[in-house]
A protein has these predicted regions:
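Charged phosphate-binding loop/patch that engages nucleotide di/tri-phosphates or the phosphate backbone
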Residues: 249-258
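Feature captures the catalytic cores and cofactor-binding loops of soluble hydro-lyases/lyases
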Residues: 3-11, 16-124
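Conserved Nudix-box catalytic region and its N-terminal flanking loop in Nudix hydrolases
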Residues: 143-187
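A short coil-to-beta-strand element that immediately follows conserved catalytic motifs
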Residues: 187-197
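Active-site-adjacent beta-strand/loop module that shapes the phosphate/pyrophosphate-binding cleft
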Residues: 140-142, 198-221, 232, 236-237, ...
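Conserved N-terminal beta-strand and adjoining loop/helix that marks the start
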Residues: 128-145
Length: 258
C-alpha cells in the first residue's frame, strides 16, 4: 500500500497499535521506550517497533520527546498515522524516524511485521498478500442479482455476492468488470450505470482492494458458471438478510442502492 511520505528512511518491526490520538509528551518514557498508563497500553515498548496511531496531539514539546527517545536508543523503527500533524512530523524528522501517513490503519493488526519506506510512502505487511478485484452489481428494474459462491472458489465459499473477479496483470478495473460478467453470467446486453470508490478490506492474510460497479440489464436471464451454485433477483433492501461477502452491503450503499 502507498501513503504520503513524511519523514525519509526505511524501518521495519512488529506493529504496536493505539486506536486513539497520541502525545509523546507523557505518553512514553524516553528512558525505557515504554508507553504510559494513560495510553491504555502501559508497559508496552515501542523501541524498534512500527508505532501506529491515528494522529498526534499535545504540546510541541512532544517533538523533543521523540528526539529524547532516540538519544536513549528507544525510538520506534517507524511511525504510521492516518493523518500526520506538525508535532509528530517534526519529531520524526528530527529523530530520523521514517514516517508515513494517509493510510487506512484498520488494515494493520497488532504484531504484524511491517516494512516502511518513508521516502516513497510504500508500506507492506509480511505474509499478507494484496490483490485488486472488481465486484459488479447487476440490476434489472428494481431488483439486483445476488449469487451464492460455490465450494470450488478460493474465498468466501457459500456466501452471497455480486459478480467478482481479479483484475489481471495489464488490465484496468474498467476492463475486468465486463469481462467477468461475460464469463460468469454468459450475457452481453448490459450497460454501466455507476461505480463507487474502491473499498479496502483486510482478512487475516490478505488485503483486498475492491472496485464496485453497477450495471443494468433488460429482460435477459443469466446462466451461471462453476463459481456459483444459485442466484436470486432481490430488492436491494432484502440483501441485508443474507450472509454476504465482506463489504458487500457497503458497496450497495456506496452505489446508492440502499
Amino acid at each position: 500500500m502507498i501513503g504520503r511520505p513524511i519523514s525519509a528512511g526505511k524501518g521495519e518491526g512488529k506493529a504496536v497499535i493505539l486506536k486513539d490520538a497520541f502525545s509523546f509528551l507523557g505518553g512514553v518514557d524516553p528512558r525505557t521506550g515504554e508507553l504510559s498508563v494513560a495510553t491504555g497500553s502501559a508497559g508496552t515498548s515501542i523501541k524498534g517497533k512500527v508505532f501506529i496511531f491515528s494522529k498526534g496531539r499535545g504540546s510541541t514539546v512532544g517533538s523533543y520527546t521523540l528526539l529524547d527517545l532516540k538519544k536513549h536508543g528507544n525510538q520506534p523503527s517507524a511511525i504510521l498515522n492516518e493523518k500526520a500533524e506538525t508535532i509528530v512530523a517534526t519529531g520524526a524528522v528530527m529523530a530520523n524516524v521514517p514516517m508515513v501517513d494517509s493510510l487506512d490503519l484498520s488494515l494493520f493488526q497488532e504484531g504484524d511485521e511491517v516494512f516502511v519506506d518513508g521516502s516513497t510512502g510504500v508500506v507492506s505487511i509480511a505474509g499478507v498478500k494484496e490483490s485488486e478485484v472488481v465486484t459488479s452489481i447487476i440490476r434489472r428494474g428494481d431488483r439486483i442479482l445476488l449469487l451464492k459462491r460455490s465450494d470450488k472458489v478460493g474465498t468466501n465459499r457459500g456466501k452471497w455476492a455480486g459478480v467478482s473477479g481479479y483484475v489481471e496483470p495489464g488490465e484496468s478495473p474498467e476492463q475486468a468488470a465486463p469481462r467477468e460478467i461475460r464469463e460468469e453470467l454468459s450475457i452481453d446486453n448490459f450497460v454501466i450505470a455507476g461505480r463507487a470508490d474502491p473499498i479496502i478490506i483486510r482478512e487475516t492474510g490478505h488485503i483486498w482492494t475492491i472496485h464496485p460497479f453497477l450495471y443494468d440489464v433488460e429482460g435477459e436471464d443469466v446462466s451461471i458458471d462453476w463459481e456459483h451454485t444459485e442466484y436470486k433477483w432481490l430488492p436491494p433492501s432484502e440483501v441485508v438478510a443474507y450472509d454476504t461477502v465482506p463489504g458487500f452491503v457497503k458497496m450497495l450503499a456506496d452505489l446508492r442502492l440502499l
